[in-house]
């Protein structure tokens, strides 16, 4: 199987513009464990290794969701309470205006976790005039992105896509990926605990789970570690420490990533292990939105802060692959568990606009692992 996994890694590294790639695959019982990397970690030519930390982008949403649910366990946050209960009044003013009706106070914490709020994505949605905010940021260079600026963009330049959804409905529930939801969840966390995100994630998750080489920008890892790999925009390096600190997304290593997902899946990340199952109680499928092609869409499903991905049977009729559960990020990174195969995997390529890469790599990894687990054919 290692040759097949190496082939997947080689293909990741060979993609246009990709300067390095990291890949890890591990069985649930750890009888099989494969970590590898290829390419240069930065423009000095430093080799990328499996131990090199890399930017995990929106995989961080798993960590944010875990912290929110830990606050729910302690009674500090309630999933079905309006999110405005936990943030300052100015943030909540007219944030969800649709057809002349302000539905901001109808949005619960659960809506934010499930991407069921209908709120516009402040980064990727296109305003009536001018470019998307993410494109403006990339052209302007490094700077802070405050919560007030995020709220102003959503309120003044964009409009909601649909009303907050009934998450108890029997039929289809509309969901649409929006980074705005998780910026608001970060605001809830920091307000409730009166502490910055880089300190919160350290005390709530990194220390209890011994994730020694994971940290949020503005913070430090628990243990001395290698310098992180560089983010790239094609063949050019992309350095934006202030912007990344504003986003709150983490740096981590492949080993820490798999350790975190194991803890999240088993419930060890929580005071009550049963809390983990809340993230996976209901799955709602994203639609396809041609106006924002870089956002996750069909056939991806979403729970509470967690993704489920599988390709339809008709897409791969002769070699279907089972679902994986976890998250991806826009920089071509992923962290997934496959319950059917009992397989954990993570990886990344650190390209600023490579969100589709994981969905091409995952089926290949699943097929390689499944073929490895199959018993040899009988000679009888």
Which functions belong to the PLM regions below?
Residues 249, 323-326, 331-344:
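Short, surface-exposed beta-strand/loop micro-motifs that present aromatic residues
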Residues 95-323:
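Short, surface-exposed loop or secondary-structure junction motifs
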Residues 2-56, 76-77, 92-93, 218, ...:
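Short, conserved catalytic-motif segment at the N-terminal edge
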Residues 32-35, 335-351:
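Short, well-ordered beta-strand elements
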Residues 9, 23, 29, 61-64, ...:
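Residue-level preference for non-acidic, small/hydrophobic
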Residues 5, 56, 60, 64, ...:
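Hydrophobic (often cysteine-bearing) scaffold residues that line and stabilize catalytic clefts
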Residues 282-292, 354-380:
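Short, gly/Ser/Thr-rich active-site loops of penicillin-recognizing serine hydrolases
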Residues 16-20, 44-112, 165-179, 245-248, ...:
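Short active-site loop at a secondary-structure junction
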């Amino acid at each position: 199987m290692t040759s097949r996994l190496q082939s997947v890694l080689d293909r990741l590294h060979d993609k246009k513009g990709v300067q390095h790639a990291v890949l890890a695959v591990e069985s649930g019982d750890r009888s099989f464990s494969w970590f590898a990397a290829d390419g240069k970690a930065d423009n000095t030519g430093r080799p990328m290794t499996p131990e090199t930390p890399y930017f995990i982008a929106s995989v961080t949403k798993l960590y944010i969701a875990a912290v929110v649910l830990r606050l729910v366990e302690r009674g500090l946050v309630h999933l079905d309470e309006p999110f405005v209960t936990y943030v300052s009044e100015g943030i909540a003013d007219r944030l969800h205006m649709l057809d002349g009706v302000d539905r901001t106070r109808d949005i619960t914490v659960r809506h934010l976790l499930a991407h069921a709020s209908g709120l516009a994505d402040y980064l990727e949605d296109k305003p009536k005039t001018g470019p998307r905010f993410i494109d403006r940021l990339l052209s302007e260079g490094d700077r802070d992105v405050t919560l007030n600026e995020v709220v102003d963009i959503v309120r003044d330049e964009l409009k909601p896509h649909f009303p907050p959804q009934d998450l108890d409905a029997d039929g289809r529930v509309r969901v649409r990926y929006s980074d705005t939801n998780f910026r608001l969840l970060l605001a809830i966390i920091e307000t409730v605990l009166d502490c910055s995100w880089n300190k919160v994630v350290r005390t709530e998750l990194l220390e209890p789970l011994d994730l020694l080489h994971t940290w949020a920008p503005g913070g430090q890892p628990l243990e001395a570690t290698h310098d992180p790999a560089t983010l790239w925009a094609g063949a050019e390096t992309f350095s934006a420490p202030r912007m990344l600190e504003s986003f709150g997304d983490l740096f981590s290593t492949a080993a820490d990533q798999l350790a975190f997902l194991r803890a999240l899946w088993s419930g060890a990340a929580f005071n009550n292990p049963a809390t983990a199952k809340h993230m996976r109680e209901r799955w709602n499928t994203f639609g396809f939105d041609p106006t924002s092609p870089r956002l996750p869409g069909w056939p991806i499903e979403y729970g509470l802060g967690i993704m489920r991905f599988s390709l339809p049977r008709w897409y791969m009729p002769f070699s279907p692959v089972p679902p994986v559960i976890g998250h991806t990020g826009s920089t071509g990174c992923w962290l997934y568990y496959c319950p059917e195969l009992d397989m954990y995997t993570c990886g990344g390529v650190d390209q600023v606009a490579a969100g589709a890469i994981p969905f091409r790599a995952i089926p290949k990894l699943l097929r390689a692992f499944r073929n490895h687990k199959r018993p040899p054919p009988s000679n009888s």
